[in-house]
């Protein structure tokens, strides 16, 4: 498997699957399973019983993890690959399409 170059807080675009074309913010990344949780993407329905934490219970809609290979970093509405470069002795992420430093 390749390295995970997507980080929490990045804006990504879905490039494959049922939500293809949607954009969202990365809520969390699981490098071990090669998945990411993206806001508003890959929504699933959960049926919750009433409990101390959830008095009413009922049907909940929440995000499910999506494979990293199905998302791409979105820079100004266009998807791009991410590479690494060294600037002033520090390793930084760079958009391969434009050469722009991401962080």
From Swiss-Prot:
Pfam families: KOW, ribosomal_L24. The keyword Ribonucleoprotein applies. This is Large ribosomal subunit protein uL24. One of two assembly initiator proteins, it binds directly to the 5'-end of the 23S rRNA, where it nucleates assembly of the 50S subunit. One of the proteins that surrounds the polypeptide exit tunnel on the outside of the subunit. Keywords: Ribonucleoprotein, Ribosomal protein, RNA-binding, rRNA-binding. GO terms for cellular component: ribonucleoprotein complex; ribosome. SMART domains: KOW. The keyword tRNA processing does not apply. NCBIfam families: rplX_bact. Belongs to the universal ribosomal protein uL24 family.
């Amino acid at each position: 498997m390749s390295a995970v170059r997507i980080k929490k807080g990045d804006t990504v675009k879905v490039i494959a699957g049922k939500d293809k074309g949607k954009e969202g913010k990365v809520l969390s990344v699981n490098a071990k399973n090669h998945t990411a949780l993206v806001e508003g993407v890959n929504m699933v329905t959960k049926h919750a019983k009433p409990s101390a934490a959830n008095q009413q219970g009922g049907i909940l809609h929440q995000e499910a993890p999506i494979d990293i290979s199905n998302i791409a970093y979105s820079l100004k509405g266009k998807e791009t690959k991410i590479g690494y470069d060294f600037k002033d002795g520090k390793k930084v992420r760079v958009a391969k399409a434009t050469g722009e430093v991401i962080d």
